[in-house]
C-alpha cells in the first residue's frame, strides 16, 4: 500500500502523471509474464495491474476476453500468478503490483489465504471488478491488515451518494472508469469529453489520487487524461494488443517500446494544464452511516445467496430497476395492466389430469400444469410481459435478452413486437444450430428483432448471458436487459420470480377446486430455475407439499458432461450473483452439457440455492437418456409433445408418482411444448434408437 502512495506522491512533486499498465498473467505464454512485467517497468510503468484470468470476464471487451481465454489454456491460476510476481521481484521488479480480476477465483482459493499469500509474494493490493461495496469493507480491512491496498472503481454513472461511500474506502487511489461499457481502446476514438467534470465531481469527496482507465491508447490521449485532472492513466487493452502483435521472442521489446512511447519516458518533462490536479481534501472514513448509501430497498439475498456482484457501471442501473419494480408491485394499476394481458398470453393455463400417464405409473394422480399452451409455447411469456411493462415505466426503448432453447428469445421478441420496441437476442452459436426453428421465429417477428450468435466459450446459454451483460453495461441509457431466468444480480431473481409465481398460485387454486386439497408433490425442471421458482414459490410455506426440482444430468454426473448445478456444484459467484455454480478448484466456470439447450447452464437462481440448503426443496438429476424416455412417454401416452426441458420433469414426476398411493396428487409443470425440439430429436434418434427401442421413420423429413 505504501509503495503505491509513494508513487503518487513522487509524481505530484514532479507535476507528472503516473502510468498504470495492465497485462493479463500468462498471456500469450506462461513464460512471457515475468519478462513482460520487467518490460513494463523499463518502459515507464509506475504501477502494474496484473490480471488474474477468469473464464467469464463480463466487464471486459474482446481483447481482454481473448487474453483470459489464452491464459486459462496455459493453465494459469492464482498460485501461478503469485509465483510470477515472486520471480519478477527476484529479477528486479520494484514497481507496485496490483492483482486485478473477478471475485470467484478469490473465493475459491479462500479470501483470507488469497490476501496473505499475495502479500508474501510481493503484491501491493487488489482491484476486484465485481466485488460489491458491502463486501468490500470487510475485504479492505483484511487487505489493510496485510498492508495491501484495496482500489475501488467509480464509473460515469456513479451517483454522488455512492461516490461518497466508495471514496471513503479508498486508501491509495481510485480507479475511475472513463466511459460506460467494457474495457477497450482505440487510437481513433476520443476519450470521454465529460472526463474533467467526472473527476471534479469525485474530488468533492476525496483527496485520494484518481487514475483513469478505459479508452486510452495513444500519447495524445494520455496527455488529454492528464490535463483533465487525472493523477494516473491506466492502459490495458492497447498493451495486450501490442503483445498480440509481437512475434515469438519479441514480446518484451514490443511492450517496452510501446510503454516508452505512451508514457514519454526519456523525453523532456511535459507541463500539464493549470489546475489539472486540484483536490478538495476529505475527512471521510468508512462507517455504517456512509454505507447506508448502498442499502437495497428489496431483500437482496436468500440466506447467503444472491447479492450484486457486478461492475460499478451497473450498480445504479440495478438500483433504478429495483426501485421501479418495488413501485410497480405495490401499484394495483400495474397488476391490473399485467392481468389485462392474460387474454394475450392465454392465462390462466390449464391444470390437466394426465389419466393415461397416471395409469402407466400406477400410483398418484399426475396433473400437468399446461404452460406449454401459453402464447409462444412456454412459461417464458409470463416474465417477458411483466418486464416489458417495467421497461416502459423506466423509459427504455431497446430490449436485450439471452436465450438458450430460444423460448425466452421468442417470448421477448413477441412482446417487443407488440409494444414496438427494438429487440436484440443473444444466443450461443451451438444453441442457434440446435434451435434453428426458434431463431427463425424470432427474426420473423419483425425488422426490430434479430439474433446475435455468441461464439465464445461453449457457445451456449452461459456465453449468451455474458454477451448480453456486456451489451447492457455499454447501452444503459436506452436499454433494458430482460433476463429470462431467475439468475443474475439482485433484483433480477426477485423480478423474474414475481412474474412467474402466477404458475404456483394457479396450481394451488385449480387443484383445490377439483380435489379440495393441496398437491402432495410439485415437480419442475431446473436450469436457471424460472419455471421452477414460479411453481414452488406459493407452496414454500406449505410444509406438507414436497418441492422437487429436476436438473439436467446429461451423460451422467459421474463425469463432467452435465448441468447438475445444485447436485454437483459449489457456492460461488457467476453473472453477478452468489449461488451454486459448476466450477473447477481454481474457481473457473466449467463447460456444461444437456440435451436440452434451456437447461445447459452452470449456475442456478439464488432462491433455489437457498431452498436446497434450507432443505425446503429437493433437487435430483435426470440424464439425457431418461429425458428422452420422458419425452417419448408423454408424447405417446397423452399425445402431448413436451419440450426437452420439461421432459426431465416428466420422467422424475412419473417416477415419484409410482412410489405414492393413488389418493395422492402430483403436479408437474409442463413448462414448454416440444415443437422446437422435434428436428433435433429426429437428428439424435438414430443414435438412441436401439437403446430406447424407439424406431421412428424419418422418411417424411426433408433431407438437407
Curated annotation (Swiss-Prot):
InterPro entries tied to this protein: Aldolase_TIM, RibuloseP-bd_barrel, Trp_synth_b_CS, Trp_synth_beta, Trp_synth_beta/beta-like, Trp_synthase_alpha_AS, Trp_synthase_suA, TrpB-like_PALP
Cofactor(s) listed: pyridoxal 5'-phosphate
GO cellular component: a single term: cytoplasm
Highest taxon, organism lineage: Eukaryota
Biological pathway: Amino-acid biosynthesis; L-tryptophan biosynthesis; L-tryptophan from chorismate: step 5/5
Catalysis: reaction(s): (1S,2R)-1-C-(indol-3-yl)glycerol 3-phosphate + L-serine = D-glyceraldehyde 3-phosphate + L-tryptophan + H2O
Keywords: Amino-acid biosynthesis, Aromatic amino acid biosynthesis, Lyase, Pyridoxal phosphate, Tryptophan biosynthesis
Chain positions covered by the region annotation Tryptophan synthase alpha chain: 1-292
Sequence positions bearing N6-(pyridoxal phosphate)lysine: 380
GO molecular function, one term: tryptophan synthase activity
CDD domains: Trp-synth_B, Tryptophan_synthase_alpha
Active site residues according to the UniProt entry: 49 (proton acceptor), 60 (proton acceptor)
Region (Tryptophan synthase beta chain): 293-704
Pfam family name, one: Trp_syntA
HAMAP family xref list: Trp_synth_alpha, Trp_synth_beta
Family: In the N-terminal section; belongs to the TrpA family.
Protein name: Tryptophan synthase
Origin species: Coprinopsis cinerea (strain Okayama-7 / 130 / ATCC MYA-4618 / FGSC 9003) (Inky cap fungus)
Chain's gene name: TRP-1
